[in-house]
């Protein structure tokens, strides 16, 4: 009988005597990566042909997990078997316990990232003596602070544990965000934006890394798509809340925008406090005073959870979840240049829709809609945004295609921007609103790219750093985006939209180029791998010091 003893994304088998047998033809790099990934990851229930079926390989990884102090190593069992029904039931349980609360926490983050867009529809800028450019400066300060905190926050989280660090920063940003109710001038606005950026910066990469502790590689992208529906959910719910709360203008002598900041800060502070009890460190660490003395999972469920994750990706056990990424390992992760193309994609891909999204309510106010109407009219685009996000993420995972599917986001945006640039100033406000709604209904590819980045990292060490670096490039792009619409270009922002058109075209070409790059890298590795003898491959598999994406038997997804 043959058994797979593969590291992620490459297929190797052993015969019954345990000698390594590697398929000789891996010239089709996409096939060698994704076909194997599909076989290994999408199958539910245990099989005989898993990575640890060979005793020598199982012992190699057992020693590696012991050396790393992997927190779940006591549940590692190469001989464990389970049924597909058991695994399906367990995944549903993880979704309810882990994914739902991760989504709620993300809503708490995005509520405070986006409520400023609704507050400015209630004359916030005028009451603070500010204009559009001042608002842009504040957004830039927030994003620079957000970006600066990404990597340090990720490193602190890796040392303390996401279950400790994330609730702490959530409580912190809720208090600071609520204090915006007491703003009186531009300087205070800038100071609070800086503090918010520093506190919020590490949340997304930290929570994505935390989710990888519970899900297999093929399960993550679609769940991240559901995770990012928080963006549209918050925009819809936030618009409804704002439509009501902003009517409180005059209560206690306050503007409606002040009440908006205060009340939403109180709500998210409650979510932050609950997160101390609802975030377990990992699959086998759910027992505590809040979650119960028996925890959320039975012993058998813990065994299944740990072994299904490790058989999907053995590298998930090469670090403890309380182990810091030291300077040497950080430098190694930073030097993983083959990950850099994805960072460039993160830098530019989301720029085109960002200014129209940020300024939607403000633009609608400028072209004649009321505060109430401007907030409610944001809802249709957000609903369509969520639908398209789920569709594009599902299609990408279904056909195992990332780059081309991701390019559809900018292809979608392009014609709407062309229409906005060419539309005469005398056109009906409803026509302009319809074009903006169409643009902002684009298929958001962020879940695909985050999953792609995590998959190509191929180790916990690299994944912890690359998640932060990727999100840092995204925030860098947001800094650029926040300064494209300028005071002298309002209310139609035609000059800004022309700039967005050029970036749109660049993004499509970039994604095709990144796909070509990874195909080239895979073919180069195929050539090296196929030039090795069977004995050389066996020795390499069990003795190499190469880690993560540097392994010759690893193939990049694209």
What are the language-model segments listed below?
Residues 140-155, 379-391:
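Central cavity-lining transmembrane alpha-helices of secondary-active solute carriers
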Residues 2-115, 126, 552:
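Cytosolic juxtamembrane N-terminal segment immediately preceding the first transmembrane helix
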Residues 97-132, 148, 153, 238-242, ...:
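Extracytoplasmic
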Residues 148-187:
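Conserved MFS/SLC helix-loop-helix module at the cytosolic interface between two early adjacent transmembrane helices
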Residues 176, 188-202, 210, 429-448, ...:
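Hydrophobic core of transmembrane alpha-helices in multi-pass small-molecule transporters
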Residues 117-118, 325-393, 446, 450, ...:
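Extracytoplasmic gate region of multi-pass secondary transporters
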Residues 399-449:
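C-terminal transmembrane helical hairpin of 12-TM major facilitator-type secondary transporters
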Residues 218-231, 251-330, 495-538:
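Central mid-sequence intracellular linker of multi-pass
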